[in-house]
Amino acid sequence: CARSPLSDNQFREQLFARLPPGTKGLEKWPDFAASLHYQPVTYDRQSFLKLAAYLGELDHAQGTGGNRIFDLAVPPGLYPVIAELLGESGLSRETGLAEGWARIIVEKPFGRDLPTAIALNAVLHEHFREEQIFRIDHYLAKETVQNTLIFRFANSIFEPLWNRHHIEYVGIIAAEELGLGSRAGYYEDAGVLRDMFQNHLMQLLTLTAMEGPARFDADAVRAEKVKVLRCVRPLARDEVARWTLRGQYRSYRDEPGVDRGSQTATFGAVTWHVDNWR
């Protein structure tokens, strides 16, 4: 669903038009497309009640049991608005309008700073149980990142050496060749620190420095990541200039939509000290 006033067929035609040339299995498209539906919504309670009713009709017709995943591919400022509307319309299952499960997916940026992140968390918990909430970092889906834990803890060669006695320092580099493109509005507000450091690179830091989890499940891995973050030495205000660096690529201010006097950082470097035995 989205705000554009499309019919099911128009939505399906748009998706079909985006299939790359040479896509295999196109003979199965009609059957697959019959399961694709579109519902126009605006950000108000009446619209979400209509969405709930429409999903109920689809559940009855297709026997889906009310199982739903709400992936909020919207501007971050709308996360709390949509979470409240999902709860008020019964789609979060808090009101028991359906028997199946519900999940809500939100991706970074999760708030602009600590107060807004806490406020967003409070809104989500008002309408969803913690087990229903998925805070996604798409960087973790990269194959190299997913292989990090296996590379470390299933490898009898490297794990015994993965400590301060054998490694002087670890450098984590996320280099991109692409410029700003069409992201000026977002990037001018976020900058490289919010865009990369407090999410993607922090995840890589914890995966690199964490201890082996008791079990390879979400709760156990998360617990070990949190232990790493608690061991990161905080930077005092007078240490920031010593341990951090900010920069901006030369043509950034020439990009469409960027202020000619912009001070937004497109490059950043931080030295962290992890104060644990490893």
Predicted feature locations:
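Secretory/organelle targeting and membrane-embedding segments
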Residues: 1-106, 110-278
